[in-house]
Amino acid sequence: MAHLLHLFCIFASIMTTYQITRPKHLQTTIKLPASKSISNRALIIYALSGGAILPENLSDCDDTEVIIQALEKMPEVINIKAAGTAMRFMTAFLATTEHGEHVITGTERMQHRPIKVLVDALRRLGADIRYEQEEGFPPLRIKGRKLEGGELEVAGNISSQYISALLMVGPVLEKGLTLRLNGDIISRPYIDLTLWTMREFGADAEWTSVDTIKVEPKPYAQRPYFIESDWSAASYWYEMVALSDDPEAEVHLEGLMDGSKQGDSSVRYIFSLLGVKTIFASKTPGKPTTVTLTKSGHRVPRLEYDFVNAPDLAQTIVCTCCAMGVPFHFTGLQTLKIKETDRIKALKTELAKLGYHLEDINDCELKWDGKKETLTSHPSPLTSVAIDTYEDHRMALAFAPLAFKMPISINNPQVVTKSYPSYWKDLESSEFIIQSL
């Protein structure tokens, strides 16, 4: 009976749809979630340091929660569900520490997300990792042990999460790690974020040339650490200000930091081109503060941008530009196909429902000519279009603000718990009307 109830709850959550109605005026103050990227890195480093002082203000998102549960319980079978970051970071952690033998697995989608690059790299360092099913994909059986470390080469155009996973275990390797990245290096800000977080915990890790990183075999220090708010989460409020018809729109976002190492802090610059002004209450280095977003009244007629260093912002900016009627050509999207879903395909499919037909080039570029098709399948202007989210949190997060321009509904809205659990609550506190259909 309990099993049937569990299945019913899962089915019910999948079938839920939220209809989003915009507020008349956008005037709100939001306490953003803590940075998921920093939380996940800090947790792995916390565990590698001996786990005495838990970082403060950890993200409450699903991705971070599965890492916390895995590190606390260390079960024989570790299910990280849909958390790709957790899969990569925990694989490196389990392979390089003496915590016994474990199987690490996830959702069906996770079992089709490649991990061969990371496994091959760890094996070259001496790790004992076996595939339980299909070669190159989870689940993995890992027997942890101390590794010697040394020199290692990987391609620079792989996911930065593979590189970050290797870097973070560098200090516990007997010889440390010298990591050379061959070819073009994508998502460099995420690598820099990892190095910065490592140094916050006393690691000696730095670029020694344009393509080489040296990590010394120096143990992490155990110290208190406070995690700043998430710039990725902030991006959806930038989108709302950009799309709002309220000339006095004003959003206050708490806990953000000027000079943040988060790659997605580039959202400030991108939205300055789309009519949003960013004002910091304080610019004290290293201190979180409140950021105020207002309309600047200025926007570009066309936008070109390379998202190679901030791929998680792509869905937000694509949706914003379409709704604002700003033609675009976006590059650097090559990692979007191996995220929670094929994000390029998902964007094209869902935006086509709204009359926006995007062109993709070689699975790494998206273009839109600024033309919107007149829809005939929705006879009433009050009829909302239902957006499928493909088990991808950023689809729900990025499409909901389109309510400022058109009636919109979000299928399976609970996916936002992966990175921003309080999103719908925050919208309601900002006078959005959220109706469950």
Segments from the language model and where they lie:
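Short, structured segments at the rim of ligand-binding sites
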Residues: 10-437
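Short hydrophobic targeting helices and cationic amphipathic motifs
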Residues: 4-7
